[in-house]
Amino acid sequence: MPEARTSNFDRMNKFGMTESFVKHKIGFTEVTIKAPEQETSDLCVKAWEDLQENHPVTPDDIDCVIVCTQNPDGKGLPHTSAILHEKLSLPLSCAVFDISLGCSGYVYGLSVIKSFMEENEFKCGLLFTADPYSKVKNNDDKKTATLFGDGATVTLLDDKPVFECGKFVFG
């Protein structure tokens, strides 16, 4: 997560909210904000670095990467997954692609990467979800300014799972 934060308490008066509303309805008191020069792939790199602190995985272990984002690097080309492929020094044989989804992206992405890995007999894959909403959100919009921040996650799927995915139910 980016280190910079914006307090939702600081926006209470602007949007006519109470402290109780912020705590109990919004559910969090601050949103993370990326640095102006940070791109989506930079947030993914940080998530990867955090993952490596707890799991012994190297770039050479990775067979595939999916990046789920609605806010890709730059203007969208090359795809964020291709940029991330280079930044992480992944093998040339590593398959990478993006999925453009928002809130439902993690569930769909997990279903896609699970199926993709099974079909191609891959042993290790990474699912990144990353969205720097500060690139597109209107900070004067009460409905989104206090809800959407910037961040990235990564989920490691390998042949030694701690948890297993069951059947996915959509709808």
Where do the language-model regions lie?
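Condensing-enzyme catalytic core mediating Claisen C-C bond formation in acyl metabolism
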Residues: 1-37, 141-171
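Conserved acidic residues
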Residues: 20, 63, 123
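Conserved catalytic cysteine-centered active-site region
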Residues: 23-25, 29-41, 71-124
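Phosphate/pyrophosphate-binding loops at sites that engage ATP/ADP/AMP, CoA/4′-phosphopantetheine
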Residues: 47-63
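Short glycine-rich or small-residue beta-strand-to-loop segments that form or flank ligand, phosphate
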Residues: 64-71
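Short beta-strand segments
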Residues: 68, 100, 125-131, 157
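Flexible, glycine-rich active-site loops centered on histidine and acidic residues
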Residues: 118-152
